[in-house]
């Protein structure tokens, strides 16, 4: 049996052009969702699954990501002086959430290259990859289940979701075989954004992966 999975990789080097003009001066991962930035939900998801060692793959103009998970002593002092305990605890929560590490993707060569930048950090351990473009309801406990499947089958695990067959041209679509488990299929192929008439299924890849180290 391999080592327990403890590391998460979060690629966050993209330019966020789909969200312009909102992302002209702000990383898309820092866009607020209710009361905190989107990236914090992703890190919290990793931590809730037991992954406290988080490597973020960043790029130019992404300093706000590191700053968000760092101390802000001036703000802390001001909140403490005001007696604003609630907000003080909220910003301290993000600071102590995980053991955060950062590596830059120097050239924008896509997702595979970004994940490859994690090689020295993850070493010979299996690891999770979480994409910030997809926010998962924590009540689904998706990542926990994926880790369980990985540990049972000793294989890499990719999250899939059922999409409307007319929308397959927007996703990577999997060719699958059924297994004895109702929530597990065996992926035999992947097709990137197929025309609906050519799609092998309506099961789309979403941004959660549990990968064995040999993929690097």
Regions found by a protein language model. Name each.
Residues 4, 50-51, 123, 152, ...:
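Short loop/turn motifs at secondary-structure junctions
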Residues 128, 147-151, 179-216:
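Catalytic-core segments of class I nucleotidyltransferases/pyrophosphorylases
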Residues 2-80, 108, 141-145:
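N-terminal glycine-rich phosphate-binding loop and ensuing alpha1 helix
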Residues 32, 102-104, 158, 189-192:
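Structural signal for conserved beta-strand scaffold positions within catalytic alpha/beta enzyme cores
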Residues 29, 99-101, 186:
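Conserved beta-strand segments of alpha/beta enzyme cores
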Residues 74-78, 85-178, 211-213:
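Conserved beta-loop-beta/alpha segment of the NTase-like Rossmann-fold superfamily
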